Amino acid sequence: MTTNKSSLSYFTDALWINNQPLVAILGICSALAVTTTVTTALTMGLAVSFVTGFASFVVSLLRKITPESVRMIAQLIIISLFVILIDQFLKAFFFNISKTLSVFVGLIITNCIVMGRAESMARHISPIPAFLDGLGSGLGYGWVLVCISIIRELFGFGTILGFHIIPKIFYASAAHPDGYENLGLMVLAPSAFFLLGIMVWLVNIVRASKTKR
């Protein structure tokens, strides 16, 4: 793959222009499970960024000596290595978050974004651009999850990062039965897909308006 793109443009393109969840509609399955709170969404976003960035770097580094016949197996092994590293790191230093995320950290290996960047980009370009492309793809995935989680946590629990944003005096009580109640729909998994769908729709509107210009 020959290109005149600067190294930084790989990062910015992956972060915004070719955002994987919003443009390619990849990596959306975890939006169901890890976006109920900002903490879990942020952690998953950073974990995927770490794995995608460094896995892409290593895949690119070994691209000229990796036989085509075992290419995808080699990529899976490399991705698995970094998934295990981040999983053990979370268990050692952020045990409560790791416990909340449960198996979903380990399932990063099945995330379409990670393998997709390794297969479509990292094995065709040099290590530094590959790392920046992977990092941008991971962070692009992460900010989408965080946006969804902010809405879900705020309206589902009345908090952001565990801090109460909606004052408790606004909530319904025996004295004020008509007060505010948390929106239970936001705690349920389908709300993540609805919110993601709205984000994809808005992105398509913006892209279409720019094309018309």
Curated annotation (Swiss-Prot):
Family label: Belongs to the NqrDE/RnfAE family.
Matches recorded under HAMAP family: NqrD (MF_00428)
Coiled coil (residue ranges): none
Catalytic activity: a ubiquinone + n Na(+)(in) + NADH + H(+) = a ubiquinol + n Na(+)(out) + NAD(+)
GO annotations of cellular component type: plasma membrane
Complex formation: Composed of six subunits; NqrA, NqrB, NqrC, NqrD, NqrE and NqrF.
Enzyme class: translocase
Keywords: Cell inner membrane, Cell membrane, Ion transport, Membrane, NAD, Sodium, Sodium transport, Translocase, Transmembrane, Transmembrane helix, Transport, Ubiquinone
A single GO molecular function term of this UniProt record: oxidoreductase activity, acting on NAD(P)H, quinone or similar compound as acceptor
UniProt keyword Transport present: yes
InterPro entries: NqrD, NqrDE/RnfAE
Membrane-spanning segments: 14-34, 42-62, 77-97, 101-121, 131-151, 154-174, 183-203
Name of the protein: Na(+)-translocating NADH-quinone reductase subunit D
Role according to the record: NQR complex catalyzes the reduction of ubiquinone-1 to ubiquinol by two successive reactions, coupled with the transport of Na(+) ions from the cytoplasm to the periplasm. NqrA to NqrE are probably involved in the second step, the conversion of ubisemiquinone to ubiquinol.
EC number: 7.2.1.1
Cystine bridges: none
Record's subcellular location: Cell inner membrane
PANTHER family, sorted: ELECTRON TRANSPORT COMPLEX PROTEIN RNFE (PTHR30586), NA(+)-TRANSLOCATING NADH-QUINONE REDUCTASE SUBUNIT D (PTHR30586:SF1)
GO process terms (BP): sodium ion transport
A Pfam match: Rnf-Nqr
Bilayer topology term: Multi-pass membrane protein
